[in-house]
Swiss-Prot record:
The keyword S-adenosyl-L-methionine does not apply. The gene is viaA. Homodimer. Interacts with RavA. The lineage of its organism: Bacteria, Pseudomonadati, Pseudomonadota, Gammaproteobacteria, Enterobacterales. One of its GO terms (cellular component) is cytosol. The keyword Chaperone applies. Keywords: Chaperone, Cytoplasm. It comes from Yersinia pestis. Disulfide bonds: none annotated. InterPro entries: Uncharacterised_CoxE, Uncharacterised_ViaA, VWF_A, vWFA_dom_sf. Component of the RavA-ViaA chaperone complex, which may act on the membrane to optimize the function of some of the respiratory chains. ViaA stimulates the ATPase activity of RavA. SUPFAM superfamilies: vWA-like. This is Regulatory protein ViaA.
Length: 488
């Protein structure tokens, strides 16, 4: 079967010019021109796809077949080219008849040429009629082939235009939320290839609007994103600078039972002491021991971490830009993180995705409760994954240790060796195993990994939060929310 590309080659038709003409006409479409004027960043991202479009169209032409009628006509034309003048004139009536049988557009013109020449009365004296006939026939074949090209390219144009309009609508809606520079616009354009309709990404728009109403959350994400932007280089002249360390002090914070002692703490009485209140003979003895602080009670003990400022020698020569690694974001989905906390946590992840797109970084989300759920928001299908993430509800338990263990395993992967871990939680959880804390310290010291805590509550346990390099506080209590609103 004759292919369209072969016919182009034999008739010396330039398919590249036809494709170029189609692409130029497509980009000049009024609906696209208006959109490009409104979103120039997305236009620049789209222009990078044009070479790929042309290659796909060329491949489509190579795979297309010529209709049987045109293929038979072209075969007849090739046979006629090989004949000398006597043979050609002898077969000319048969050629005209075959053209009529094939319903060729050239059939009428061929019949007219033969009738005008009147070969029966005026035998040809040269090859002028043969040359004219073959030239007109070739022109007709070229026109038929170009018509097939136009039909094929028009189908591709309609499909491509519909796809572009869908992707442009998606990118245009998300552009104010997720893009801050050309790099982010390009990555957003690449991520818009999924089969998403307008109703699918409405949730993204809702959280984008919520994020705009929380400017403090945006600033917090930007500060976290820039926190690894520079590193200090030593210089010969040393000087001192203050720095803050966390000092551990034993305290009676209710973290764990460490024994029994004598006190007057009614809330932590042993059951045997309460028995005395039920016996009239021992009731006065109970009150006497209460006044003397000699009642047997549970001893609850934990760690109280306080900030202490010290001096250390430091020398700085310059700040050299560091490559910014990907984000591994762990989100607490326990019941205490529901409601406004859930909205803030999801919006903060959206803000981190915006930074990741702008800085060409990756953004990996892990939800920790009774099981670990993974999403990579910066992947090619990142928009679909972001929508699935935003549809999650925070109603589980808290398993911070399992999440941190998964984060450490992820950091062992070569693709994530320079990642920053971001933990979003209220940090009202059980104490971390000492072995896990030790592994985290190794990652921090040996591999320069940074662990960030985004605390959504003022009541997080100090014993948990001491492992983090940075603690970013965003108190979601009603009082703090009212204060932030009043300051705007």
């Amino acid at each position: 079967m004759l292919s369209l590309a072969t016919l182009d080659m034999l008739l010396s038709i330039s398919e590249g010019e036809l494709i170029e003409e189609m692409v130029v006409g497509l980009l000049a479409a009024p609906q696209l021109a208006i959109f490009f004027e409104k979103f120039p960043r997305i236009k620049r991202a789209l222009m990078k796809d044009i070479p790929g479009w042309k290659q796909n169209l060329q491949q489509r032409i190579r795979e297309a077949s010529v209709p049987p009628g045109l293929a038979n006509e072209f075969s007849l034309y090739q046979q006629s080219l090989l004949e000398d003048s006597p043979q050609f004139y002898a077969h000319l009536p048969d050629i005209v008849a075959q053209l009529q049988d094939l319903h060729s557009p050239f059939a009428t013109q061929a019949k007219t040429l033969v009738q005008t020449a009147d070969l029966a009365k005026n035998p040809p004296g040269g090859d002028s009629l043969q040359t004219l006939f073959l030239q007109r026939w070739r022109v007709s074949l070229i026109l038929q082939t170009i018509t097939i090209h136009h039909q094929l390219l028009e189908q591709e144009r309609e499909q491509l235009l519909a796809e572009l309009q869908r992707r442009l609508a998606l990118s245009g809606a998300l552009e104010p939320i997720l893009t801050t520079n050309d790099n982010a616009a390009g990555r957003l354009w690449d991520m818009s290839q999924g089969h998403l309709q307008r109703g699918d990404y409405q949730l993204l728009l809702q959280y984008g609007d919520f994020l705009q109403q929380q400017p403090e959350l945006i600033r917090l994400a930007e500060q976290l994103g820039r926190s690894r932007s520079a590193k200090a280089q030593p210089a010969p002249d040393a000087r001192y600078e203050p720095y803050t360390v966390m000092v551990r002090q034993p305290d009676s914070v209710p973290e764990e039972v460490s024994g029994i002692h004598q006190s007057n703490d009614i809330l932590r009485l042993l059951p045997t002491e309460l028995v005395m209140l039920g016996m009239s003979e021992l009731e006065f003895e109970f009150y006497r021991r209460l006044l003397e602080r000699r009642l047997l009670t549970y001893r609850l003990q934990g760690d109280n971490w306080q900030e202490k400022t010290q001096q250390r020698p430091v020398s700085l020569k310059q700040n050299d830009e560091q490559p910014r690694g990907p984000f591994i974001v762990c989100v607490d989905t326990s019941g205490s993180m529901g409601g406004f906390n859930e909205q803030c946590a999801k919006a903060f992840c959206l803000a981190l995705l915006r930074i990741a797109l702008a800085d060409n970084r990756r953004c990996y989300i892990m939800l920790f409760a009774t099981e670990i759920i993974h999403y990579e928001l910066s992947a090619d299908n990142g928009i679909e994954q972001a929508i699935r993430f935003l549809n999650q509800h925070f109603r589980g338990g808290t398993d911070l240790a399992a999440c941190l263990a998964n984060t450490l395993n992820k950091m062992e992967d070569r693709e994530w060796y320079d990642a920053d871990a971001v933990i979003i939680s209220d940090f009202i959880a059980q104490r971390l195993p000492e072995e896990l804390v030790r592994k985290i310290k190794i990652q921090q010291q040996a591999h320069q990994h940074r662990f960030h805590a985004v605390a959504m509550s003022a009541y997080g346990k100090p014993g948990i939060m001491r492992i983090f390099d940075h603690i970013w506080r965003f108190d979601t209590s009603l009082k703090s929310r009212l204060i932030r609103r009043w300051k705007r």
